[in-house]
Amino acid sequence: PRRAHSIAAQGGINAAKNYKSDGDSVMRLFYDTIKGGDFRSREDNVYRLAEISKNIIDQCVAQGVPFAREYGGLLDNRSFGGVQVSRTFYARGQTGQQLLLGAYSALSRQMEKKKVVFYPRHDMLDVVLVEGKAKGIVTRNLVDGKVETHSADIVILATGGYSNVYYLSTNAMASNVTANWRAHRKGALFANPSFT
C-alpha cells in the first residue's frame, strides 16, 4: 500500500468546516465541486461527499495525519484550486503521502489486533462469484508463484487509479486497469472511465 500513486498528491482536501468563518457550507462546497467538474459530475454523489467532508478530515486526524495547524492549534486551511473560500486542509506539500501513511498506520494497528490479515506481494487474478455475487478472489503469490483463493462476505477492490490505460500518464506504471477489467469481465458495472 505504500507504493500507491496517491503519495504524489500535494494540494489538500476540501471540506466545509468553515474554520475561517467566511460563510462556507455544504451547499457552497457542493456548487464549487460541480462547477469545477464542468457540471459533468453526478450531483447526488458530490452532495454526499460535501456532507461527509467534515467527518473525513476528522477521521484523517484521528488516524494521525499531521495536517498543517495555525499557531493556536486549530487545523489550518487555504484557498486552493479555484474555490471561493478557504477550505483546503493540507499537510504542507505532501498531503497524499501523509494520508497514505495515516491510512497505513491505521491498517497496521488492525493487523496487530489480528482483525485484518495482510497479503503483501500478491496479484489478483480473478474474482470468485457465487450465485452472481463476488464472494472472494484468486491471487498469485509473487514470491513463490502459488495460486491461492481468499473467500469473503464482501469484496472491495481498492486498486487506486488506472490512468495508465491512456497512452500518456504521469501515474506510476502499476496504476493500470487490470483489476477493474477482471471485475468487469465477471459482471461488475463500470462507469465514468474518463474520470481517473
PLM segments and residue spans:
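Well-ordered beta-strand positions in beta-sheet-rich domains
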Residues: 147-151
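Conserved N-terminal/central alpha/beta ligand/cofactor-binding core
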Residues: 2-135, 139-141, 146, 164-165, ...
